[in-house]
Amino acid sequence: MEKFELHILGCGSALPTTRHFATSQVVNLREKLFMIDCGEGAQMQLRRSRLKFSRLNHIFISHLHGDHCFGLLGLISTFGLLGRTADLHIHSPKGLEELFAPLLSFFCKTLAYKVFFHEFETKEPTLIYDDRSVAVTTIPLRHRIPCCGFLFEEKQRPNHIIRDMVDFYKVPVYELNRIKNGADFVTPEGEVIPNHRLTRPSAPARKYAYCSDTIYRPEIVEQIKGIDLLFHEATFAQTEQVRAKETHHTTAAQAAQIALNAEVKQLVIGHFSARYEDESVLLNEAAAIFPQTVLARENMCITINNYTDTRDYDPL
């Protein structure tokens, strides 16, 4: 099965702490890297997670609060110092290009690569990226400013050829692509060999959703129904529900309720408020509702294989 991993670079919220970096993640799908949000220190965390800068060509920004985008300028500058020549694409709600264009023109005048900004609306689900491996769609969220999450949907791989059966029926090589994609085979004598005799199904396509920052929003459940992995912000414990609503954030219990209602396979919670030195209170609160919950932590890597496992990278 081809690689589909989530790397947690940072899982803190707006106030910097010595425990957490600001929010940033990287999705590795078939060796293509996609960054989600880019808080301060993201480039340092890329190195610690042993991710290759050259494979990162698309960055998705959920909203224009500093803890989700202050790392962009440093990352763009570092790419330039490393001699990057490949285009970099940044996808965000409206306003990011207007904010960053003056900074780039001042600090990054000699870049040998182009930076393209792709801005989108946040009110409706919108397909914002599509290639042969993955489609990325926005998830409308409710925050104090326009904000959205992102749904990464792997493209279904073709069926696997059963070599012994292909040899038995003497299937020509030029027919194999058609058969992989579901076609039957007709022998020279006119016998129809059904596809299921010649192939076995590939593994089901996998899905990952990122939802931060947002007030409790049950409306997203249908869009993320049955996905393999959900990251949902859990800034506060339920005892701070009023504060969560005032600041347009979510409690751990509310994040777990979303996961439960959406029937996801695993939940990762993060974007922790700096007030919690012991985040087990958030984990316990969420796990009481949705047991398949884990706490995000820096340098965590989660493998998505229609089941999930986690590991940490030792910092370099």
UniProtKB/Swiss-Prot annotation:
<dbReference type="Pfam" id="PF12706">
    <property type="entry name" value="Lactamase_B_2"/>
</dbReference>
<dbReference type="InterPro" id="IPR013471">
    <property type="entry name" value="RNase_Z/BN"/>
</dbReference>
<protein>
    <recommendedName>
        <fullName>Ribonuclease Z</fullName>
        <ecNumber>3.1.26.11</ecNumber>
    </recommendedName>
</protein>
<dbReference type="GO" id="GO:0008270">
    <property type="term" value="F:zinc ion binding"/>
</dbReference>
<dbReference type="InterPro" id="IPR001279">
    <property type="entry name" value="Metallo-B-lactamas"/>
</dbReference>
<dbReference type="InterPro" id="IPR036866">
    <property type="entry name" value="RibonucZ/Hydroxyglut_hydro"/>
</dbReference>
<feature type="binding site">
    <location>
        <position position="213"/>
    </location>
    <ligand>
        <name>Zn(2+) 1</name>
    </ligand>
</feature>
<feature type="binding site">
    <location>
        <position position="67"/>
    </location>
    <ligand>
        <name>Zn(2+) 2</name>
    </ligand>
</feature>
<feature type="binding site">
    <location>
        <position position="68"/>
    </location>
    <ligand>
        <name>Zn(2+) 2</name>
    </ligand>
</feature>
<keyword id="KW-0255">Endonuclease</keyword>
<keyword id="KW-0378">Hydrolase</keyword>
<keyword id="KW-0479">Metal-binding</keyword>
<comment type="similarity">
    <text>Belongs to the RNase Z family.</text>
</comment>
<feature type="binding site">
    <location>
        <position position="63"/>
    </location>
    <ligand>
        <name>Zn(2+) 1</name>
    </ligand>
</feature>
<feature type="binding site">
    <location>
        <position position="271"/>
    </location>
    <ligand>
        <name>Zn(2+) 2</name>
    </ligand>
</feature>
<dbReference type="GO" id="GO:0042781">
    <property type="term" value="F:3'-tRNA processing endoribonuclease activity"/>
</dbReference>
<keyword id="KW-0540">Nuclease</keyword>
<comment type="subunit">
    <text>Homodimer.</text>
</comment>
<feature type="binding site">
    <location>
        <position position="65"/>
    </location>
    <ligand>
        <name>Zn(2+) 1</name>
    </ligand>
</feature>
<feature type="binding site">
    <location>
        <position position="213"/>
    </location>
    <ligand>
        <name>Zn(2+) 2</name>
    </ligand>
</feature>
<keyword id="KW-0862">Zinc</keyword>
<keyword id="KW-0819">tRNA processing</keyword>
<feature type="binding site">
    <location>
        <position position="143"/>
    </location>
    <ligand>
        <name>Zn(2+) 1</name>
    </ligand>
</feature>
<comment type="function">
    <text>Zinc phosphodiesterase, which displays some tRNA 3'-processing endonuclease activity. Probably involved in tRNA maturation, by removing a 3'-trailer from precursor tRNA.</text>
</comment>
<feature type="active site" description="Proton acceptor">
    <location>
        <position position="67"/>
    </location>
</feature>
